[in-house]
């Protein structure tokens, strides 16, 4: 069946301290919160929601489960470094530029930039 999937609607990230994570994702990444209730907080990221989930047993992946897209990756990297966020170096692969960073729970997340 063609057209079964239209987009990824929501990405979930488990966090150990929802209030701290809400503050970090709002202030450091500049995301706008859609709603916050019952141990969940959703942020707008383009058409996709990033939903933080309060959890007690946090397991971090060994690689980023997704990348945030930006058109100014070097400025984003600089801003994260200035905010004392643990980041990897920016890597230019030619057709895509990326770097990874960690949120307060140590989740590896990424930024990418490429010509659309």
Predicted regions mapped to residue ranges:
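Conserved hydrophobic/aromatic beta-strand scaffold that supports enzyme active sites
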Residues: 42, 67, 98-100
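Helix N-cap motif at beta-to-alpha junctions
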Residues: 17-18, 71-73
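N-terminal beta-strand motif that seeds the catalytic metal site of vicinal oxygen chelate
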Residues: 1-20, 49, 64-66, 115
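Conserved short beta-strand elements that form part of the metal-binding/catalytic scaffold
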Residues: 32-64, 108-114
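Short amphipathic alpha-helices within nucleic acid-binding modules
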Residues: 24, 74-79
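Vicinal oxygen chelate
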Residues: 1-4, 10, 78-116
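Amphipathic alpha-helical segments
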Residues: 17-32
